[in-house]
């Protein structure tokens, strides 16, 4: 991703650094609907995820995470911006006339060809099962957890996992979070890294740009009232009045593990991610 700096004319352009993406106005049957987030509310209208709401209207892009168009070569026609994710997406035209969106592999350009199947070359953008001749140390993304369900791991911008080992019916992967876990060798993955890896270098420059993304302001608990937060209350700039920081619901805020106990996948995780 190329970072674009504007000539300084306003405070927002002075502090902003955006990616110089190419937005496409392509309209096809893969772009549909008015995709609006739930604004952090559940079905009863109660806030379950804070700091969400507003944002610009979005159209949903149907992404092919399954890559089940087997043994048919496809050509990258466009590289487009997707408002629903940080990664870019590619429009693929397959030889049988099928058109699908996939996540943009880093380094792929317009005109490149991709293919999916069991006996395909180990090439960037190709999708194949882990049980094939994929060498150890291969960088992969869009990894399936359940066979046939589609990729669920390593799909964010710049995400990449590494194939560490193969033994028996399982393959050992190191995920972007640092977690090391087992995956069935029958599951598929895409070779390469997800594009737009420099998205963390982007600076929005002003609060209004954050609102366009559907992210609302974050208020510190120490400036709230006692009824709203355990850190609230006091006269002037008072300390939190506790030994350790707490969440708005009174639980320890720093270092507390939030993963549920006795999950089915506990036996598959060889090393936990670093918190």
UniProtKB/Swiss-Prot annotation:
It comes from the Eukaryota. Its main location: plastid. One of its GO terms (cellular component) is mitochondrial large ribosomal subunit. It holds the Pfam family Ribosomal_L2. The keyword Plastid applies. It comes from Populus alba (White poplar). Keywords: Chloroplast, Plastid, Ribonucleoprotein, Ribosomal protein. It is found in: Plastid, Chloroplast. Residues 1-20, 225-275 are annotated as: Disordered. This is Large ribosomal subunit protein uL2cz.
